[in-house]
């Protein structure tokens, strides 16, 4: 068969008959399927596009057969940096580049037989479309949701444009990969942070995949804590920090401000000004990722100023450090080095006090415990790489040196004394004092319960000089040097095991426990202490409970040509004034020079005829905004426009939006979870709040697909030479084979490597389906003997296509085809196979169906299964004689046990093996086997 000829034939048929055109209204139930509309790059469609588009196309085709009015539209996300950079690289105007690339994409999509409703096609670059993007921006502005502010922004020196936080994730430009730097610029912003809680709550009204929900939850980054106000010693200034652990305030021994903090210049003392200024300049050259990298060396500079810890009145130094960002939280932190790794490293480097205010609790509390303070001392022999232990055998097992601190004795002196008394070693050197632990235990040698506060120490042995032990009468143990394996295997006591853990990982104690060194909080657990500290802060008017969100406002300006012009005018008398809505769209001027400028301004700033205008409010000479919108603007609402694509009175009528209700099934990349999808949800929630859309969430199900990798499991790229061009595959194997293979290649939600062998296997399957046509008996009735497998297949394929299990849907169809190949089957049976395969491989199934004389499958009904018929009514089981299989019998699934025994004994081969022998017993294991025991 000529696959290409067949495919062109049916593509023309579908287009001529307008098979896939969706109507707004009618008796059919609406179902809206959407795949992210692509940026039409110069490279054309790739096999990753084919995977996601085929998956949604299969769902759309099945839903149409099930009687739904399916909207499956396609358009073009063509504004923004990608199109502009392609145009610059190829010396072509973005408008012309987009037009050419769209034509290529569209031809490729049609060649693959995707059932898009092309009557609703549009591009974000169409003035008829971006008129409404501009109109919606004006609604943001008029409702106080759009504002202009001078802020530190992410700047890409290569693209010469501002990037949103989402576009600069990881500290690099999402588009070109260049390192992002910080710049102060005046930018249009949307108050997206005002919607943080609504965006979190709105997830409950969606059916998003769990990993998609989690991605959004993490990006929004809600945390509940407290704002605490610190006075600056010698100044009338105050600053606020946000912390989730206000209960650790007693342990705050310094504060850190972002280098950009507004008070830095004012509070820095004269002797520190030069160093602080140099540090600030160095920070300005770093991006956020570089500044907050956890593994980098901690840097900072003392300002010479001090803050007052509000809970104890102590003066604590104020530093600046690059790991604190002005754009996150309040731009200031309180540091509790005993309980935060980063604070601990910083404190160690700058010799800042470390005060432990939490101690972990080990052991089990008991009544009538004796209280005392004690130590656990770990002695390490560097030469032999072994640790000193005390082995109490069955009276307590293996432990480290431990003991009670005497009155007037320090914990350190106690540790030295106990090592000497219990082991005789006297030449030791302190390595670390370890965090205190609150421990409950039973002392075997004293037959008492104790609650102790234990201080741990790690020492190293300087030499082997040893005195005799000084032991109490009840102390009987062996002193043994052991390696780490023995310690890990044999030290079971919680206190000693925890002390060893601290010794192996010295630093901050980041777990929870009870409070110490905390005055009013001593002895309280985390929850109790937070509650009490919040009450204290509010009573003393130096803090309050606060919910914080990581998500910032949306940076909405771009210093580029190829984007929607922002419809705002700057008047020297009136300030910023919105354009009159009736004057929209504000068109991009037709210019020859569109490259980004060296001074960081948009190229539009150089077009005086376009920039200069009159103020809509007072008529005075004014200037247009020359920044353009980000490429995310047009994609934030495009799914609404598809509902009513030709409306020139409004972006979409409420009637049309209520009819379609919302997107039932939306497929897109996981990389867009914290960008496009979050922006779109914010945009819709705003429109809902001003009464312009019917639902607060206009997307119900959101799913994501895995990438198609090269055959070596690497990401496809031109530089690696592993890019697969779908045009080549279509020309050699046909669109149906490519579609089938991409659905069969693996779990749809996971990355999958390309395999030409598997592609050929899919071609062989289609060839088998073709061959089966000539075996079909000319009858229009389904074959009774095939009833169970047919109903099983209908059920499996139907469920798989709605749960993204496309690979198992294909394998199920392969099983059905194999079953046909080994049985007699009718035309009706064959058409059933074609119908179930049609959503994935539509062209060849239409052709084979037509050859049988049936109406086209695009008008057919999807087969329904009967649950009762998905269960085998008759099964085959084995018959054993003394454990060896001697025959098989067919039985009904509910056959009586006596009847099963009778059939087993009647089998000819079984008869021969039991003849003349005594039957001891007959065992029937229902549905599996019969075992006859003879002698």
Predicted regions: what they are:
Residues 305-311, 315-326, 611-750:
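Alpha-helical recognition segments enriched in aromatics with Gly/Pro capping
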Residues 405-495, 505-510:
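Unchanged
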Residues 1-30, 273, 351-355, 360, ...:
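Basic, alpha-helical terminal appendages of large translation-related enzymes
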Residues 360-400:
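N-terminal strand-loop-strand
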Residues 77, 142-154, 544-574, 631, ...:
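Helix-rich, typically C-terminal accessory recognition domains appended to large enzymatic cores
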Residues 9, 13-17, 88-239, 246, ...:
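Residue patterns forming the tRNA-binding/recognition surfaces of aminoacyl-tRNA synthetases
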Residues 3-11, 47, 132-359, 832, ...:
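NTP-handling and nucleic-acid-processing catalytic cores
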């Amino acid at each position: 068969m000529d696959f290409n000829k067949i495919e062109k034939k049916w593509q023309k048929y579908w287009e001529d008959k307008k098979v896939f055109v969706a109507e707004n209204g009618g008796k059919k139930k609406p179902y809206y399927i959407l795949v992210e509309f692509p940026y039409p790059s110069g490279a054309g469609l790739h096999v990753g596009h084919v995977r996601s588009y085929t998956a949604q196309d299969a769902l759309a085709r099945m839903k149409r057969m099930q009687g739904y009015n399916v909207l499956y539209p396609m358009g073009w996300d063509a504004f923004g940096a990608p199109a502009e950079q392609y145009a610059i690289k190829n010396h072509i105007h973005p408008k012309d580049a987009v037009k050419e690339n769209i034509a290529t994409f569209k031809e490729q999509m049609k060649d693959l037989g995707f059932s898009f409703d092309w009557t609703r096609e549009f591009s974000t670059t169409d003035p008829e479309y971006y008129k409404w993007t501009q109109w919606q921006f004006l609604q943001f502005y008029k409702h106080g949701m759009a504002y202009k502010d001078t802020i530190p922004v992410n700047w890409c020196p290569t693209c010469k444009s501002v990037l949103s936080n989402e576009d600069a994730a990881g500290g690099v430009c999402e588009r070109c990969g260049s390192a992002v730097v910080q710049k102060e610029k005046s930018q249009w912003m949307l108050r997206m942070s005002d919607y943080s809680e609504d965006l979190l709550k709105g997830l409950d009204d969606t059916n998003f995949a769990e990993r998609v929900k989690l991605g959004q939850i993490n990006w929004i980054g809600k945390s509940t804590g407290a704002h605490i106000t610190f006075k600056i010693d010698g100044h009338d200034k105050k600053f606020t920090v946000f912390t989730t652990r206000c209960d650790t305030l007693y342990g705050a021994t310094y504060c850190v401000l972002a280098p950009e903090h507004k008070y830095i210049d004012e509070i820095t003392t004269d002797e520190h000004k030069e160093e602080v200024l140099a540090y600030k300049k160095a920070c300005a050259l770093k991006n956020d990722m570089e500044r907050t990298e956890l593994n980098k060396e901690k840097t900072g500079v003392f300002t010479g100023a001090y803050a007052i810890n509000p809970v104890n009145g102590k003066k604590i130094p104020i530093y600046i450090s690059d790991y604190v960002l002005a754009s996150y939280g309040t731009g200031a932190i309180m540091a509790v080095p005993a309980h935060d790794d980063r604070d601990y490293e910083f404190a160690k480097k700058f010799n800042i006090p470390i005060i432990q205010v939490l101690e972990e609790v080990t052991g089990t509390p008991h009544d009538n415990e004796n209280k005392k303070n004690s130590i656990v001392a770990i002695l390490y022999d560097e030469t032999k790489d072994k640790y000193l232990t005390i082995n109490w055998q069955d009276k307590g097992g293996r432990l480290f040196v431990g003991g009670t601190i005497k009155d007037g004795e320090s914990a350190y002196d106690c540790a030295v004394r106990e090592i000497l008394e219990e082991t005789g070693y006297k030449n030791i050197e302190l390595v670390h004092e370890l965090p205190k632990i609150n421990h409950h235990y039973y002392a075997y040698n004293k037959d008492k319960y104790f609650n102790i506060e234990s201080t741990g120490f790690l020492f190293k042995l300087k030499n082997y000089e040893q005195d005799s032990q000084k032991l109490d009468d009840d102390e009987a143990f062996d002193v043994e040097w052991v390696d780490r394996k023995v310690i890990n295997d044999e030290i079971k006591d919680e206190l000693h095991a925890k002390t060893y853990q601290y010794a192996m990982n010295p630093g901050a104690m980041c777990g929870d426990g009870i409070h110490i060194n905390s005055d009013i909080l001593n002895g309280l657990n985390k929850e109790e202490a937070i509650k009490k500290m919040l009450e204290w802060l509010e009573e003393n008017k130096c803090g309050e409970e606060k919910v914080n969100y990581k998500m910032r406002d949306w940076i909405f300006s771009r210093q580029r040509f190829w984007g929607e012009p922002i419809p705002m005018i700057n008047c020297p008398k009136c300030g910023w004034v919105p354009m009159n809505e009736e004057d929209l769209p504000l068109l991009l001027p037709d210019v020859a020079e569109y490259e980004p400028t060296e001074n960081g301004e948009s190229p539009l700033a150089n077009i005086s005829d376009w920039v200069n205008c009159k103020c809509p409010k007072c008529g005075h000479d004014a200037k247009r905004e020359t920044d353009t919108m980000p490429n995310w603007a047009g994609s934030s609402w495009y799914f609404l426009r598809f509902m009513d694509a030709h409306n020139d009175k409004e972006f979409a009528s409420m009637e049309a939006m209520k009819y379609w209700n919302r997107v039932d099934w939306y497929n897109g990349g996981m990389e867009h979870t914290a960008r496009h999808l979050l922006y779109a949800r914010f945009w819709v929630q705003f429109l809902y709040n001003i009464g312009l859309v019917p639902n607060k969430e206009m997307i119900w199900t959101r799913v994501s697909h895995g990438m198609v990798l090269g055959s070596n499991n690497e990401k496809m790229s031109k530089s690696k030479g592993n890019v697969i061009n779908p045009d080549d595959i279509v020309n050699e194997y046909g669109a149906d084979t490519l579609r089938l293979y991409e659905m069969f290649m693996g779990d749809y939600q996971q990355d999958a490597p390309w395999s030409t062998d598997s592609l050929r296997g899919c071609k062989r399957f289609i060839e088998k389906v073709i061959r089966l046509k000539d075996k079909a008996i000319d009858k229009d009735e389904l074959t009774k003997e095939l009833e169970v497998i047919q109903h099983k297949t209908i059920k499996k394929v139907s469920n798989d296509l709605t749960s993204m299990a496309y690979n198992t849907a294909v394998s199920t169809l392969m099983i059905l085809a194999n079953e046909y190949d080994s049985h007699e089957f009718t035309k009706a049976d064959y058409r059933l196979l074609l119908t179930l395969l049609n959503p994935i491989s539509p062209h060849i199934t239409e052709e084979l169906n037509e050859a049988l004389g049936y109406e086209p499958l695009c008008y057919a009904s999807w087969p329904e299964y009967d649950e009762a018929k998905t269960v085998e009514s008759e099964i085959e089981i084995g018959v054993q004689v003394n454990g060896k299989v001697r025959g098989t019998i067919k039985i009904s699934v509910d056959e009586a046990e006596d009847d099963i025994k009778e059939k087993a004994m009647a089998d000819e081969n079984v008869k021969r093996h039991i003849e003349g022998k005594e039957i001891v017993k007959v065992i029937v294991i229902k549905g599996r086997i019969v075992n006859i025991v003879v002698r």
